[in-house]
């Protein structure tokens, strides 16, 4: 039996099809995400209003992420993703026809339903289709394939926005997402026909049980507590500056829309090249090593960004490359660590709860970042983020250790190690 398990491919046919649908959906998403602050600015928003927009845009997801994870745990990953994809397509409509930046909040609210259902399901689905000893590696390979979207999406979006305007670019992005929706609906239908997953009844009692268990783990002061605290600190610092970076590159760096697309693509290439080594590193020496090194790389990238002279724009490529390496190293490690730290039947709820908790903590951060841009200087929000990332390495190195007992409790049985459909 052991030999048969070892012969199982790291990526099953279903997982490859799952990733293909994700690629189509997120090529559409990456075509506009890097340019969303600039689109808001194009519709008449000031720097402070851009910060306010991204603060308000976080409110709806706060109420949906936990519900999305719970629905994923109850109905199954593929069903939850299919339902979310329908809302994702609908969300593109107000985005394309908006004539004021305030209308984009409607698009973001509808899109939040899609992200709430798809986001927790993505990591949980991959975790369920991998054995524990190879989980970091599978997350790394999946992320490497998935990062095609960051290589293709931003340059395509930048070229279309610069040449034909934001609306046509968003329309094409919506077509990519529509193709993904059709694929996902087909996968969910086939899973239902084959009886691959038995959906549970959605009930308030089951939600209460899941939340009670998760809050107990958070309050215990163990690994889950420290993951939440350090990731919350990281998210707060990122929200200070993340949504202002495209504006910074355009106004301070002097980059065009096409150039912003290309430097963002370098981020995707470097992340794609490092996620597999990051997953391997996670499996071999532990998750905290990749997470700590990734934080250092991202901090260095931000410090480089704020010191780039306007007449040397090619340094932005190096900065985005460093950021891509950092994210590539820490992402599979984080995903692997969370999936091992919580019970298998609650992974969707766990990923949703983490997203919600982080959103609550970082809710005012985009608005505060915009205030710091205006009241101090444009570089200050990025410098603050870089300092926080460096300081977070200390608790990560000390506390991000999975106890041996947890590894045994979460280890899959020989039967569950064989790839199955959801």
What are these regions (language model features)?
Residues 1-12, 190-226, 414-422:
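Juxtamembrane intracellular "pre-TM" segments in multi-pass secondary transporters
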Residues 74-85, 284-295:
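Cytoplasmic membrane-interface "Motif A"-like loop-to-helix N-cap segments
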Residues 175-196, 392-400:
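C-terminal membrane-cytosol helix-exit motif in multi-pass small-molecule transporters
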Residues 35-48, 243-258:
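Short amphipathic helix-loop junctions that connect adjacent transmembrane helices
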Residues 64-76, 161, 275-286, 373:
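Helix-to-loop junctions at the C-terminal end of transmembrane segments
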């Amino acid at each position: 039996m052991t030999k048969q398990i070892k012969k199982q491919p790291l990526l099953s046919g279903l997982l490859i099809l799952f990733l293909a649908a994700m690629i189509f959906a997120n090529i559409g998403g990456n075509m506009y995400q890097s340019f969303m602050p600039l689109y808001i600015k194009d519709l008449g928003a000031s720097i402070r209003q851009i910060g306010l927009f991204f603060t308000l845009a976080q409110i709806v997801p706060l109420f949906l992420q936990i519900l999305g994870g719970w629905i994923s745990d109850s109905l199954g990953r593929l069903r939850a993703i299919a339902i979310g994809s329908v809302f994702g397509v609908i969300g593109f409509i107000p985005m394309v026809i908006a004539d004021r930046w305030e209308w984009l909040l409607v698009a973001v609210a509808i899109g939040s339903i899609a992200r709430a259902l798809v986001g927790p399901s993505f990591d949980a689905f991959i975790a369920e289709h991998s054995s524990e000893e190879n989980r970091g590696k599978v997350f790394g390979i999946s992320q490497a394939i998935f990062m095609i979207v960051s290589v293709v999406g931003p340059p395509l979006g930048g070229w279309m926005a610069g040449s034909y305007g934001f609306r046509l670019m968003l329309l094409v992005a919506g077509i990519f997402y529509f193709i993904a929706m059709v694929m996902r609906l087909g996968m969910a239908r086939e899973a239902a026909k084959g009886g691959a997953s038995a959906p549970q009844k959605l009930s308030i009692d089951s939600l209460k049980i899941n939340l009670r268990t998760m809050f107990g783990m958070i309050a215990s002061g163990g690994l889950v507590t420290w993951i939440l605290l350090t990731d919350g600190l990281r998210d707060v610092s990122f929200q200070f500056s993340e949504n202002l970076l495209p504006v910074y590159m355009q106004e301070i760096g002097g980059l065009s829309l096409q150039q912003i697309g290309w430097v963002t693509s370098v981020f995707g290439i470097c992340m794609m090249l490092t996620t597999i080594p990051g997953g391997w590193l996670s499996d071999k020496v532990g998750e905290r090593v990749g997470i700590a090194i990734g934080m250092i790389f991202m901090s260095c990238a931000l410090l480089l960004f704020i010191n780039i002279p306007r007449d040397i724009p090619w340094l932005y490529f190096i900065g985005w490359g460093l950021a891509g390496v950092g994210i590539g190293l820490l992402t599979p490690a984080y995903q692997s660590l969370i999936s091992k730290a919580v019970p298998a039947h609650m992974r969707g709820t766990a990923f949703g709860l983490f997203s919600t908790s982080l959103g609550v903590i970082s809710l005012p951060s985009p608005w505060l970042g915009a205030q710091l841009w205006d009241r101090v200087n444009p570089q200050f929000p990025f410098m603050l983020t870089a300092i926080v990332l460096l300081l977070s390495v200390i608790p990560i190195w000390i506390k991000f250790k999975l106890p041996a007992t947890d590894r045994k409790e979460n280890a899959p049985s020989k039967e569950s190690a064989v790839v199955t459909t959801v």
